[in-house]
Amino acid sequence: MRFTKKGNKIDIDKAEREIVEAIDLGVNYFDTAYIYPGNEVALGEILSRNNCRHKINIATKLPQYLIKSKKGIDKYFNEQLSRLKTTYIDYYLMHMLTDIAAWEKLKNLGIEEWIKEKKEKGEIRNIGFSFHGNTEMFLKILNAYDWDFCQIQYNYMDENSQAGKIGLKAAYDKGIPVIIMEPLRGGKLVDLLPHKAKEIISKSPRGYSAAEWSFRWLYNQKEVSCVLSGMNSIEMLRENVKIASSTQIDSFTEEDYKTIEEIKSEINANIKVGCTGCGYCMPCPMGVDIPATFRCYNEMYTENKKSGRKEYFQLTAFKKDINDASRCIGCGKCEKHCPQHIKIREKLKEARGELQTPWIKLQLKALRILKPWQ
């Protein structure tokens, strides 16, 4: 849940009312992470106060990007147990894996043996990973270990980006449950919809809200195991539970799919690059993640500039092999394979100019020097 703040601290009393209500309504999966300020502590305190730890599943994440030794793994894990006031974690994730190199680093630190030990002791019940990257990397990580579950960003606008539909189906085919994050793209598929998209929703005979269209599109798919939603009000909580409990797999009609496509069309009307994310331009000999760069560039204009730049930094900064757009040398190899005939070199230059602000450039430079992944 997304806890409401009172000043600089979480409003623990309000959060408690929301969590207790959620449990009463049947919600049993609570997602948090080490780097969410105050979140683990608040959740642990509330569960302890109400003696309801046994009723729910806690999912939290190892900040793998901060770890440089096996001792570091134990340090963060033990601190999380203390924060959450529990002796075990139901669903433990390697947080924000972006490429196979991040997993290989953890393997070299002995993570596989560590996981085996924690599972045998009952301190971890399920092991997984949360992913931010492209489909190719998702498939590599998916097949690199015997995962119990995984977590991906997925919504009707990200169907063909990040892990995407291909990644979702691949996990399902392997029998790996998939947890969905960002079903509303951080609320943007509700709050930042173009006027014409809102009109399409309001005129639909279904009578669904913008959020309901997004959730129903997800719940319609058999490959989706669980959908996360950042809720900070009782009203939002009740609405989301109602939608989840009233949606069936394969319940979408042709008209429903048509409505989603019309909404997407209006959102895409403001895109800067007609990239479909097919990946035929890859691999770039210099390592530039071309589809991801264009996706973030488009996001600046279909949503807002801050979110596009934030995602760009997230996707480029924490990789062992730096892959930001500034590495393009203009060789043109990518353009020979683009089915959309995009002038990739020209568009990468445009994207770099808007995505790489002086502040982002400074942070990327610092990360290259510090190399926290080593």
Locations of the language-model features?
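Glycine/proline-rich, positively charged
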Residues: 2-10, 20, 24, 67-184, ...
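A short, structured active-site edge motif that brings together acidic residues
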Residues: 54-66, 92-95
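Structured C-terminal cap/extension of enzyme domains
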Residues: 21-23, 27-28, 47, 166-374
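Short hydrophobic/aromatic-enriched beta-strand-loop microsegments
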Residues: 54-57, 146-153, 248-254
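N-terminal binding-site loop/beta-alpha segment at the start of enzyme catalytic domains
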Residues: 1-56
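Short beta->alpha linker loops
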Residues: 34, 38, 98, 132-133, ...
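Alpha-helix-loop-beta-strand connector modules within alpha/beta enzyme cores
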Residues: 41-60, 112-122, 173
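Short catalytic-loop micro-motif centered on adjacent basic/acidic residues
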Residues: 28-34, 125-129, 151-152, 226-228, ...
